[in-house]
Regions:
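A conserved acidic beta->alpha catalytic loop
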Residues: 37-50, 102
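C-terminal catalytic/acceptor-binding lobe
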Residues: 159, 163-259
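Short beta-strand-to-loop acidic/aromatic patch adjacent to the donor-nucleotide binding site
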Residues: 91-102
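Cell-envelope/extracellular polymer assembly enzymes that use nucleotide-activated donors
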Residues: 2-4, 34
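Short, acidic, metal-binding catalytic loop of nucleotide-sugar glycosyltransferases
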Residues: 21-32
C-alpha cells in the first residue's frame, strides 16, 4: 500500500526541510511513500530547496515530487493547491501536512498502512493530531483514501480542508481512522511548545510569527477562520458555492455507503 503525503508552503524552506526530513528518516518503507510539495510560480526558494534534496538522495528510494501551481492562489484559495495534487497523487491515500509539523515515531507509514488496509473498498477519512494539541480529541491534520477521492473527485471543496472533511465524516456518521502517528505541531507565533510523550515532558522552541499568522496569504492578514465546512471567506458568493460543493460531496458519499 502506497501513501501520499503533501506539503503546501511559501518561502519557508528551512521549516519545510525539517518537516520533510522527519517523515523521510522515520519511515519504514520510503519506496512506498510518495512525498509531494507544491509551491507558487514565484517561489524559487521552495522549488530549489526540494531540487537540492532530490539531488542529495540522502535516503535510498526517496524522491519528492516538486510541483508548481499555475498561479499564486494564496491562503484565500488553499484548496486549489490540494486539488492540483489530487489530480496527480498515485498513493492509496493522501495526507495534507503543514510545514511546521515534525514526525516523532519510527515506522509511521506502517501504522497508516495497517489502519487503512481493511478499508480499501470503502471511502474513509483519517484524522491525525499533534501530541501537543490542546484539542486532542480533534483532528488537526486529515487524510482521505483513494476511494473517497474517486467518489468526490476532489480533495476539498474549500480552504478549510480539515473542517470540510471532518464535517463530511460527521454528517455521514463515519468516524475517522486514527493511526498512531505521533507528531509535534510547532505552531507559529509561540516561543515554546510543551508536550508529553512516553510519560516524559518536553519543551521545545516554537517558530517565529512571520506576520501572516503563518499562512501563505496574498492579503496582509488571513481571512477569518469560521471553522465552518461551507465557508472560509467573507465573500458571500464563495460561501454559496462552497455550500453547493459540500452538499454534492455529501450526496455522493451517502450513495456510496447506501450500496
Amino acid at each position: 500500500m502506497k501513501i501520499s503525503i503533501m506539503w503546501m508552503t511559501r518561502k519557508r524552506s528551512h521549516e519545510l526541510i525539517y518537516s520533510l526530513s522527519s517523515f523521510i528518516m522515520r519511515a519504514k518503507d520510503n519506496s512506498n511513500v510518495e512525498y509531494i510539495v507544491i509551491s507558487d510560480p514565484d517561489d524559487n526558494e521552495t522549488y530549489e530547496a526540494i531540487e537540492k534534496i532530490n539531488r542529495m538522495c540522502f535516503v535510498h528510494d526517496v524522491e519528492i515530487k516538486n510541483l508548481v501551481s499555475d498561479k499564486r492562489y494564496g491562503y484565500e484559495e488553499l484548496e486549489k493547491y490540494q486539488n492540483i495534487v489530487g489530480e496527480v497523487f498515485t498513493g492509496d491515500c493522501l495526507f495534507i501536512m503543514n510545514d511546521d509539523v515534525v514526525c516523532l515515531n519510527d515506522d509511521w507509514d506502517e501504522e497508516i498502512r495497517n489502519s487503512l488496509k481493511p478499508h480499501v473498498e470503502n471511502a474513509r477519512w483519517i484524522g491525525l493530531a499533534g501530541v501537543n494539541e490542546n484539542w486532542k480529541g480533534s483532528t488537526t491534520f486529515v487524510g482521505i483514501n483513494r476511494k473517497w477521492y474517486e467518489i468526490t473527485n476532489r480533495v476539498s471543496g474549500n480552504r478549510a480542508t480539515d473542517g470540510y472533511i471532518m464535517t463530511l465524516g460527521k454528517k455521514l456518521g463515519i468516524e475517522p481512522l486514527r493511526p498512531k502517528v505521533e507528531m509535534v505541531h510547532l505552531q507559529r507565533g509561540r516561543e515554546t511548545v510543551t508536550f508529553e510523550r512516553n510519560n516524559k515532558r518536553y519543551i521545545t522552541g516554537g517558530l517565529p510569527d512571520d506576520g501572516l499568522g503563518g499562512y501563505p496569504t496574498k492579503s496582509p492578514k488571513p481571512p477569518k477562520y469560521y471553522h465552518d465546512p461551507n465557508e472560509f471567506t467573507n465573500d458571500y458568493t464563495d460561501f454559496v458555492e462552497g455550500k453547493k460543493r459540500f452538499d454534492n460531496d455529501f450526496q455522493k458519499l451517502k450513495e456510496h455507503y447506501a450500496e
